[in-house]
Amino acid sequence: MPYRILFVCTGNTCRSPMAAALLENKQLPGVEVKSAGVFAAEGSEASVHAKMVLKEKGIEAAHRSSQLKKEHIDWATHVLAMTSGHKDMIVERFPEAKDKTFTLKQFVSGTDGDIADPFGGPIEVYRAARDELETLIDRLAEKLQTEQ
């Protein structure tokens, strides 16, 4: 079964594009990845620090932000939000997505918890977010490969 993973954060310039780039970098067969934001401006690049901390891991992030739309929801098999607030907003706007929408932490480890927004912080805060995401994306990749 192909997986179409949609990562969602606020502005689609930090957390969700980092998560998407980390998962795409694994080049898992049968896994497609997109990202969007609940309050995103269309067409912005990923933040400078987000691109820098990905580059430290050898990952180039060619990304343009996108506002979350019905087409994203219809495309996705799994909608993975960065926070419970994002998850609640997604389900409120798109009730049909309820059964496929989770926080990333909930989906990979069954625990509640948000991924802190590094927006506007120093590069160390972005590194911490990247490292947390990297651990979660490793678990996500294992889960997807096990379920295929």
Curated annotation (Swiss-Prot):
Substrate binds at residues 10-15. SUPFAM superfamilies: Phosphotyrosine protein phosphatases I (SSF52788). One of its GO terms (molecular function) is protein tyrosine phosphatase activity. The record marks 13 as: Important for substrate discrimination. Keywords: Hydrolase, Protein phosphatase. The active site is at residues 9, 15, 117. Therefore, this novel tool for the selective enrichment and subsequent MS analysis of arginine phosphorylation should facilitate the investigation of this highly overlooked protein modification, in particular in eukaryotic samples. Gene3D superfamilies: 3.40.50.2300. It catalyses: N(omega)-phospho-L-arginyl-[protein] + H2O = L-arginyl-[protein] + phosphate. Changing residue 117 to A/N: Mutant does not bind to the arginine-phosphorylated substrate. It is an enzyme of class 3 (hydrolase). The keyword Hydrolase applies. The keyword Hydrolase applies. Irreversibly inhibited by the synthetic inhibitor cyc-SeCN-amidine, which inactivates the enzyme by inducing disulfide bond formation between the two active site cysteine residues Cys-9 and Cys-14. Its EC number is 3.9.1.2. Belongs to the low molecular weight phosphotyrosine protein phosphatase family. Is present in solution as a mixture of monomers, dimers and higher order oligomers (trimers and tetramers). Catalyzes the specific dephosphorylation of phosphoarginine residues in proteins. Probably counteracts the protein arginine kinase McsB in vivo. Exhibits almost no activity against pTyr peptides. Protein arginine phosphorylation has a physiologically important role and is involved in the regulation of many critical cellular processes, such as protein homeostasis, motility, competence, and stringent and stress responses, by regulating gene expression and protein activity. This is Protein-arginine-phosphatase. It comes from Geobacillus stearothermophilus. The lineage of its organism: Bacteria, Bacillati, Bacillota, Bacilli, Bacillales. The gene is ywle.
